[in-house]
Amino acid sequence: MSQDTEGPPTITINNYQLDVGKEFTYLSSTVTENLFMDSEISRRIGRATSTLARLSKRVFDNDKLTMNTKMTVYRACVLSALLYGSESWTVYSRQERRLNTFHMRNVTRILSIKWSDHITNNEALRRAATPIIYTLLRQRRLRWQGHVCRMQDGRIPRDLLHDELTTGKTAQGRPQLRLKTVCKRDT
């Protein structure tokens, strides 16, 4: 889980050595060995897709519900499943584009917009009264950053954000994207 070139650490509890895994799930979020977000994004898209599928017949394909009600359910259920834990994600632009593609596909489907209608994404978002995914990610990160900045000194999230726990060497080559860098980009 570090960027060091050394092997993974060995952890022993009561004379039992724990196995080192490539990835694990903690609080419904996937943590990988290389700290990339690809598997987490795939899992979030999968969860949001299953939520959307379960609600399709009753909500999104129901002609008796207003568009406002459908979009409220979409934001409350599907976007919540999609963006769960996104406050601490360090996503690259290709991953943001993947999330935005999923979001726009669902918005245009809920609004019953066909590709032959020649409606732009901005117009579809305006009709749905929902922001683009980049804005949603930025809002969540900034809200979390404000929460962390108000924490007392010595709290682990605050120390991590302000690089007060950094020790060791970094790997050669381009450094991985950090949450601090993403937060600076947002402000």
Kindly label every feature range from the protein language model.
Residues 1-187:
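Short linear motifs embedded in intrinsically disordered, charge-biased segments
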